[in-house]
A protein has these predicted regions:
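Short, surface-exposed "cap/lid" segments of acyl-processing enzymes
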Residues: 53-84, 88
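Alpha/beta-hydrolase active-site loop
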Residues: 103-124
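Primarily recognizes the serine-hydrolase "nucleophile elbow" in alpha/beta-hydrolase
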Residues: 119-178, 186
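Short beta-strand/loop motif that positions the catalytic acidic residue
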Residues: 198-199, 205-207, 211
């Protein structure tokens, strides 16, 4: 009888612990986990991935052309855990939505699309969002920040693994670049050619020492073409997405956000 009462007590305690764990997990997911929403940009529905609570300092994280995987979600989760409100944007899906047999995304239209994103992200906070882009998303973020109206709606740009050549379309056949590490056979734009137009907004770049897609020399060249305020952090990491040194990457990312805040146009 004593053993049975003991077992019942243990089971009861375990049950309470499980319920507490489930509750804690639910609260964590509510605070930092991903939910989704749909916004309409020039007649096209775009799914956005939301992390954190609206009202925190807003950021827009644009993915690479692989979609909402790897570094983009990592950045979103890390920043939401610090209290920021993150709008995750799938650059691959965005490009696909404007790609047809006869047309692609036009550079003149892209900044206005990001202005819609910026207005959405800023809602409820009264603060301008920072654009954070991964690879292709970094190029799109730089392009958006060259437009005077969009500049007025954002705080600056943090470019992660920024390539010089960025595509303006995406088709299934373009996935070959993941093997070749080349550039899709699509219309493109050069970030080095437009980086100087981001000023007076601050432009930060974070790059891996062993980026297999974008050599350090390429991002240094783009930095040279940009005007102040500008800054480059280089992280000792094994690949394009900093996969073996996310700890240092995360620290540099927080430093870049602080630097953006301290270098706002006067």
């Amino acid at each position: 009888m004593t053993v049975m009462r003991c077992n019942d007590s243990i089971r009861g305690a375990l049950g309470r612990l499980i319920l507490l764990a489930i509750g804690a997990l639910g609260a964590s997911q509510q605070a930092f986990g991903q939910t989704t929403d749909v916004i309409v940009i020039r007649g096209h529905q775009q799914i956005v991935h939301l992390y954190g609570r609206r009202g925190g300092d807003p950021v827009i994280v644009s993915s690479g052309d692989g979609g909402w995987i790897h570094l983009g979600p990592h950045v979103a989760e890390a920043l939401a855990a610090k209290g920021l409100f993150v709008v995750g944007f799938d650059a691959k899906a965005y490009l696909e939505s404007y790609t047809s047999s006869g047309s692609t995304l036009q550079p003149a239209d892209e900044p206005g699309d990001y202005r819609v994103l910026a207005d959405y992200a800023a809602r409820g906070s009264g603060r301008k969002p920072t654009l954070i882009g991964v690879s292709e998303g970094a190029g799109l973020s730089v392009l958006a920040a060259t437009d005077p109206q969009t500049k007025a709606a954002i705080a600056g740009v943090i470019a992660l693994g920024l390539p010089d050549t960025n595509e303006l379309a995406w088709r299934w056949k373009d996935s070959l670049i993941y093997l070749t590490h080349g550039v899709p056979n699509e219309p493109t734009f050069s970030t080095a050619a437009i980086a100087g137009k981001v000023t007076p907004l601050p432009l930060a770049m974070i790059h891996s020492t062993h980026d297999e897609f974008v050599p350090v020399a390429d991002v240094q060249h783009t930095l040279q073409q940009a005007n102040e305020p500008k800054k480059l952090w280089i992280v000792n990491a094994s690949d394009h997405r900093f996969s073996n040194n996310l700890r240092d990457f995360d620290q540099r990312l927080l430093e870049a956000l602080d630097w953006i805040a301290r270098n706002q146009p006067r």
